[in-house]
């Protein structure tokens, strides 16, 4: 059963209802991301390694080597976007979670996680409202070496004032260093399709799948921001956050992702009618494309080159970058060139926000792309909607 208790700040978008035998209807709600301090410096190639690992692609040796570089913060902290998380209440605990449309698990650091692995993290302690699911386990392991696993509980989870009392919460017993070092994130809230949830022997539903019947529309919309916290709208679209109309395209969810096909693309003034098949993934930082497109993009950037020591394309920090656009039906979604300037790697060089998808088999439209768009994830189609941010 879904119980709702709407925050005062959200009353313009939601209607408080009392518990009922069926899921109560609410207009919708919004949750804002929160900026968090940067931790230990991580080379931008770590974002590449993370994405390759997430989709079980081999992490190239040069990417792995560059990603392993650590040390004091030597980059300009405004040269790439801050890290943003969203506050979620799990049981009696408030955690900072990464909302990820590229996965379908809600997993958290917990009191079951060894103290040495949860240091610096807020964590979930199963309390009186928690019910352990006997025999249920979960496990994730990625090609970059990151992994986590543990037990599963049913507990109350609250996002933006809307609660679900029996949400599957994957409590971490083991967490690899790739996750423990990121003290900004206390876990992940997956928003992909429940078909790829990793709980065994019985996969569990995502938070969105559990609450979508209580919303006026089974949708959520994402307005990530460049160098600023973004917002997630659940159950409605906010016309103040986009310009023009929303263009929709069918979703291929056969692999559990929000997959779609762009009809063509442009680099600056040069256009191509070649289509791009990819997924919309808020949990991936970069825009990862086929090598031919990546090469073509950086051919238009003076001084750009693939630097194996950096694990990707770099260019002079003073270089002017062309816009990158994709065509979706009659709509052109444009990523401003400045968004593709991702991170300073020293010696006057910048790591690009467009990089290779390493033969994953599809492109990944990560945050570099999404931060220019208002994107609607509509479960009723399923379909995706795109409009330029206001």
Swiss-Prot record:
Reactions listed under catalytic activity: Hydrolysis of proteins with broad specificity. Generally favors hydrophobic residues in P1 and P1', but also accepts Lys in P1, which leads to activation of trypsinogen. Does not clot milk
EC number per UniProt: 3.4.23.18
Gene3D superfamilies: Acid Proteases
Boundaries of every Peptidase A1 domain copy: 84-387
Subcellular localization(s) per the UniProt record: Secreted
Annotated glycan sites: 70
The keyword Signal belongs to this UniProt entry's keyword annotation: yes
A single Gene Ontology CC term: extracellular region
InterPro entries associated with the record: Aspartic_peptidase_A1, Aspartic_peptidase_AS, Aspergillopepsin-like_cat_dom, PEPTIDASE_A1, Peptidase_aspartic_dom_sf
Homology family: Belongs to the peptidase A1 family.
Entry protein name: Aspergillopepsin-1
Organism: Aspergillus oryzae (Yellow koji mold)
Lineage, highest ranks first: Eukaryota, Fungi, Dikarya, Ascomycota, Pezizomycotina
